Amino acid sequence: MVADNSEKSTKSVANGSLISTVSSKDDLPNAIIVTQVPEDVFDNKQDKANFSSLFTQIEKDIHFDFLRSFRRVRVIFSSPENATAAKLIVQGFSFKGHELKAFFAQRIYMSANSQMLSPPPLEKQFLISPPCSPPVGWEQTKDMPPVVCNFDLMARLASFAIDEKYEVHNGDELTPAIIVHPCETPIDVPSAIEMPRTPRPSSPCEQ
């Protein structure tokens, strides 16, 4: 009795899982795959039309996928009820001496979320060549002018006119004026300081 109860509970669990998986009508398959299809169906237009009429009598607007390499045909219906009716008709049906077999095909769900890589966000897309229209409200930034020291500029200009004096800072009531009087470097002044040479130490032979 214990074994029977466990077996019944196992069946109930299995049935419960089966019911939960097909609780929605959208989970049922709406397509079948017909196997052992004669080669004449793929080559002869009339045989293909006769084969298609087996399913168009159930539903007119259906889709066929003729898989010649596998000798199979996938038939997609609009509802699971029509797919079930077509499977019952085709299963064991003899067509041009070949017994057809059919089984349900897995339902294909078209997802709106693409698994492909998406383009970059729009805030920097206008910087990519070729440039496109910038976003609304975007304004061109102005570059800051170069910072030039007046003292350095005046010193550079004064180097070209040695004989002329130039005023670095204008004097006012609180600070005196700064005037630079350039002068030429005397010719006899050495350009560099001479460093004394270190004598070479004597060798043992010289001693």
Swiss-Prot record:
Residues 176-181 are annotated as: Required for tax-6 interaction. Expressed in lateral hypodermal cells, marginal cells of the pharynx, vulva epithelial cells, ventral and dorsal nerve cords and commissures and various neurons in the anterior and posterior regions. Expressed in male tail structures including the diagonal muscles, sensory rays and spicules. Expressed in PHC neurons and most tail neurons and support cells of the phasmid neurons. Also expressed in pharyngeal muscle, head neurons, excretory canal cells and hypodermal seam cells. GO terms for biological process: calcium-mediated signaling; positive regulation of nematode male tail tip morphogenesis; response to hermaphrodite contact; thermosensory behavior; vulval location. GO terms for cellular component: cytoplasm; nucleus. Changing S133A: Resistant to serotonin-induced egg laying, a behavior positively regulated by calcineurin activity, resulting in a reduced number of eggs laid in a tax-6 (jh107) gain-of-function mutant background. Interacts with tax-6 (via catalytic domain); the interaction is calcium-dependent. This is Calcipressin-like protein. The lineage of its organism: Eukaryota, Metazoa, Ecdysozoa, Nematoda, Chromadorea.
